[in-house]
């Protein structure tokens, strides 16, 4: 029993040391895929963390998610469907920006999606590995964003995407995702990625992380949000 108590005490001290460690820097967290399921969105908004929420247009709960997010004083974004390298993997059908569309078609689809979610402050890409690496397509999308005063975050679903570069050249406020937090649905894996993002922000001064409006992700954030808030990041 004494050995067990000693091990528990050592483990507690180790956890306390991590919690007490002070970090510096800024971490921006974007919650993607809002609109499919409202429950994780509610749970995340109720954490009162300064997350940004990227909402897919035209889904069953898109409007409800927007209402919950804005009602909670959080930042709402459009999660704009864009063409992936493999069209057969395209999840959003006719609302997706395609690289073989004319500039006018791209702008029309982009405006329609933006208008469907009044009050959004910015846009990031859903899928889009092919579209975000196509300069002409990105220029057409970003022209609309510039006209409407919206920022653009390149989700970095493809290492050769140029969305943020094109945005910068056009004077559109922009940034690029640095890390995905929930490629695994295991809560412990997600928590480990959250701390990896915190350390990245501390090391570089800032970082952007993307995760998704899913039950396991919401549960993971619920377990660590107080520690992250207390970490100094």
Each PLM stretch: what is its role?
Residues 103-194, 200-202, 206, 212-229:
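Catalytic domains of cell-wall/extracellular-matrix polysaccharide-remodeling enzymes
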Residues 1-24:
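Terminal interaction modules at protein C-ends
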Residues 26-33, 94-104, 183-189:
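Active-site mouth loops of central-metabolism enzymes
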């Amino acid at each position: 029993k004494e050995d067990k108590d000693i091990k528990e005490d050592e483990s507690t001290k180790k956890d306390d040391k991590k919690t007490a460690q002070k970090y510096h820097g800024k971490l921006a967290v974007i919650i993607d895929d809002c609109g499919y399921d409202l429950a994780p969105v509610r749970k995340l908004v109720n954490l009162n963390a300064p997350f940004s929420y990227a909402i897919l247009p035209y889904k069953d709960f898109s409007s409800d998610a927007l209402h919950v997010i804005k009602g909670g004083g959080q930042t709402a974004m459009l999660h704009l469907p864009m063409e992936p390298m493999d069209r057969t993997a395209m999840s959003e059908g006719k609302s997706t920006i395609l690289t073989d569309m004319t500039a006018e078609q791209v702008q029309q689809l982009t405006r329609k999606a933006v208008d469907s979610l009044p009050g959004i402050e910015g846009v990031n890409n859903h899928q889009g590995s092919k579209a975000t690496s196509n300069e002409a397509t990105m220029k057409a999308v970003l022209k609309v964003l510039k006209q409407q005063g919206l920022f653009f975050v390149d989700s970095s679903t493809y290492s050769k995407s140029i969305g943020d570069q094109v945005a910068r050249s056009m004077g559109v406020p922009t940034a690029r995702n640095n890390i995905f937090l929930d490629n695994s649905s295991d809560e412990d894996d997600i928590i480990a990625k959250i701390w990896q993002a915190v350390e990245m922000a501390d090391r570089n001064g800032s970082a952007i992380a993307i995760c998704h409006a899913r039950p396991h992700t919401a549960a993971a954030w619920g377990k660590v949000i107080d520690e992250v808030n207390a970490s100094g990041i």
